Amino acid sequence: YEIIMCFIYGYLPANTVVRTFNFAAIATILMTLIYELMNVQREIYSFNVAASKKDKYVIARLEGEDEDTRRENELFADSLGGTGEMFCVRQASFINDFFKRVNTRPSYYKTLNYLIPAALAVGLVMFVYGLLSPFSRQGAAASFMGGYAAIMMVLPVAGLFNYSYPFYKASKAAFSTGSTIVGESSLDEYSVGSAISFDDREVFPADRVKIKTIQVVGHMSIDSAIYYASKIFGKTGGPLDDALRSMTQGYEVESRVELLEIAEDGINAVVDGSHVLIGRSEYMTANGIRPINPEEDEEIESGGEVCVMYMAVNDAIAAKLKIQYIIDDDFESILQQLSRAGMCVGIRTFDPNINDRMLSARVRTMRYPVRVIKCRTTENRGKVYEHYSSGILSRSSVRDLLMAQIYCDRILHTIRTNTAVKIFAMAVGAAITALVISLGLIGSLNSLEVALFQFFWLVPMGIVSRLLI
């Protein structure tokens, strides 16, 4: 624009005012630098989490050939009708494909393929309008200046802010809890998720599970009942393993444990040569063992916090345990936010007491899509992968990892909303330029006014970002 004006300036009338709009151009460059700065800082956050020496929790696609993974896939497929990606939580020491994810452009940048040509088209239209409109009656130079001013008014400069600030804000919040989203491409990858599963101990932490009473029968002692239970659940893991481990701390002994069967409502095992059944009253009855006063179980469990579990040793009833499960305070909040993001939640468990009925007594499951997934094999329990490729990770906890997952949907929603704001801003800029050309005031439009118009739209975009993230 300025080169052309240099060549034609000598041929213009003496009173012609030529505007260069350099300040607006410099403001655009400044916005580009701010965009790059926020992106670099966001990538530093991601690298610091990914490079941590701690094992990281990661969001992984639900893949594998083991029995539990197949059952989980089938359960989610039935619930979701076969649509959407299914994810689970795993642990890994090293994160693969970090720089590949950082350098991959997301799909929402394709919007610029339409907005920038649209801005150039507006400039061309305003140039022609300045030449031909009966309202403007301006010369070719003034019309050319009007077209260039229109381009500077409608260029998606605020789009750079839109593509950097929401993600930067979410990354900063995630990093404060030891989590991160790696690269902009991960937003697309993980926002399409329809289901995610994680372990039961995230719902019922160790300090929220307590064995209230142990009623023993015959020659069984309380110590022996605790010993058998701790060895069996030590194999399966979960909240009962944590609770029993704290009760037997300092009394660990080597033992031989073989799990013969893991059913939905009980576990069949051999502990140091003794045949042990542990589970719900239905499991005992199915194995020919009469529970202790089963008629009182319904009344005990109706309160919503205590579950009843039985133990049989060598085909004889041995103990009745009453166990209190208190749900984690933050779980329902996480569940609510995942539900808003359109995700179904699966809770993986070996615990006979944790089922859909038990969970519905503690969480308003009818309001949220949540299912209990009964595991059958222990081969992958507690497995830490040496290498894993994931775009969402946390060095602190599964809860913080899930919050990072929730941010993906929020960021994309914010970007889409702000894109609509930017399109509206472009329309307003085109209308203002057309009005200025019609009034013959294009020579009065200065560079500062154009820059202020562009930066004005950062205010509503910033407000939208703060409200939605």
Residue ranges and their predicted role:
Residues 199-201, 280-281, 322-326, 348-354, ...:
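Structural motif
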Residues 212-214, 219, 325-327:
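A short acidic/small-residue loop/turn micro-motif
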Residues 1-65, 70-195, 392-469:
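Hydrophobic alpha-helical transmembrane segments
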Residues 248-359:
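Signature of the cytosolic headpiece of P-type E1-E2 ATPases
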Residues 187-213:
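Asp-based phosphoryl-transfer active-site loop
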Residues 18-21, 171, 202, 273, ...:
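Residue-level signal for inorganic ion chemistry
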Residues 77-80, 84-113, 215-264, 285-288, ...:
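ATP-binding catalytic core of ATPases
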Residues 351-373:
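Substrate-recognition/cap helix-loop segment adjacent to the acidic, metal-dependent catalytic center
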